[in-house]
Amino acid sequence: MTNIRKSHPLIKIINNSFIDLPAPSNISAWWNFGSLLGICLGLQILTGLFLAMHYTSDTATAFSSVTHICRDVNYGWVLRYLHANGASMFFICLYLHVGRGLYYGSYLFKETWNMGVILLFAVMATAFMGYVLPWGQMSFWGATVITNLLSAIPYIGTDLVEWIWGGFSVDKATLTRFFAFHFLLPFIISALVMVHLLFLHETGSNNPTGIPSNMDMIPFHPYYTIKDILGLFMMILVLLSLVLFSPDMLGDPDNYMPANPLSTPPHIKPEWYFLFAYAILRSIPNKLGGVLALVLSILILVIIPFLHTSKQRSMTFRPLSQCLFWLLTADLLTLTWIGGQPVEHPYVIIGQLASILYFLIIIVIMPLTSLMENHLLKW
């Protein structure tokens, strides 16, 4: 009799994806983040489902329903903070996952990479809408400022914004639809993840050397399941430390004040994981230009496979490209810091320089350096 995991039509798919999947024998801990992201998504859907049972998406009661969850629901505060800080862990894993792809040349699997970029946009949209739901000051003003950016689109902008708002300002209709979409999108993301994995399993995983590893593969289970569980424990340790010791560390104190359309907070800013894009948006003193730069800061990932000029896939043996990669990382951290600062000297000029450097490294310096390294190989 054949083993059921190899013959059953449903279990067979799981077996070929997570158990008998041939994986390169030398992939490092940087390959852990895919599974961690899957776990983050599951955690967010689960905690979100229980939160949705107690939340009301009405401007009059949204803020107090969140307070009710934290005070009166059994372990409601754990659910709320797991969900809020789980989003932060999600983005940490996402950015490290993308960074790994950039460093080791995984972007040359174009279908998988482009699917990943679509996933990144979907997760960002979901997180933005989720931030609006507690209906605090930063929720309301963040929603107003970010949705208002669409009015920069020529001709249809104003109509588009009012259509999204469901009125002439961010109000009850906006909150209700944001809740509906925030609930729906994670399930769409789950479907997109399946497609992402489908594309990945067509080609197989990349590895740190960037050299094809078809002749040296090992089964995913038990080797990488154990390795992934270690990564999972480390992530849970960080997440629980955040939730149980300083749950509000990554949040904004202004969001503990109920939304008031008549009082603007002194400094409107999004959650920390959007600050780098927000800094790029603010660095251009033109509304449409800023919006374009904001979208391009993420969309630029799509053209990266076409900017690959090196003869080697990975950066493992390319010291000059490595320096540029870490310069880009430092630049993104600088942008994240600037995004949280007020719009005044010297932050404005630092933000502008960091924004220019960001696009310059990706579009110009990196491809030229790769060409130079190709010539150095001939010596």
From Swiss-Prot:
Top-level taxon in the UniProt lineage: Eukaryota
Record note on cofactor: Binds 2 heme b groups non-covalently.
UniProt GO MF annotations: metal ion binding; ubiquinol-cytochrome-c reductase activity
InterPro entries reported in the protein's UniProt record: Cyt_b/b6_C, Cyt_b/b6_C_sf, Cyt_b/b6_N, Cytb/b6-like_sf, Cytochrome_b, Cytochrome_b_C_euk/bac, Cytochrome_b_N_euk/bac, Di-haem_cyt_TM
Any one of the GO BP annotations: mitochondrial electron transport, ubiquinol to cytochrome c
Cell location: Mitochondrion inner membrane
Residues reported to bind a ubiquinone: 201
Reported cofactor(s): heme b
Positions annotated to bind heme b b562: 83, 182
PANTHER family associated with the record: CYTOCHROME B
Function: Component of the ubiquinol-cytochrome c reductase complex (complex III or cytochrome b-c1 complex) that is part of the mitochondrial respiratory chain. The b-c1 complex mediates electron transfer from ubiquinol to cytochrome c. Contributes to the generation of a proton gradient across the mitochondrial membrane that is then used for ATP synthesis.
Subunit text: The cytochrome bc1 complex contains 11 subunits: 3 respiratory subunits (MT-CYB, CYC1 and UQCRFS1), 2 core proteins (UQCRC1 and UQCRC2) and 6 low-molecular weight proteins (UQCRH/QCR6, UQCRB/QCR7, UQCRQ/QCR8, UQCR10/QCR9, UQCR11/QCR10 and a cleavage product of UQCRFS1). This cytochrome bc1 complex then forms a dimer.
UniProt name for this protein: Cytochrome b
Organism (species): Pipistrellus pipistrellus (Common pipistrelle)
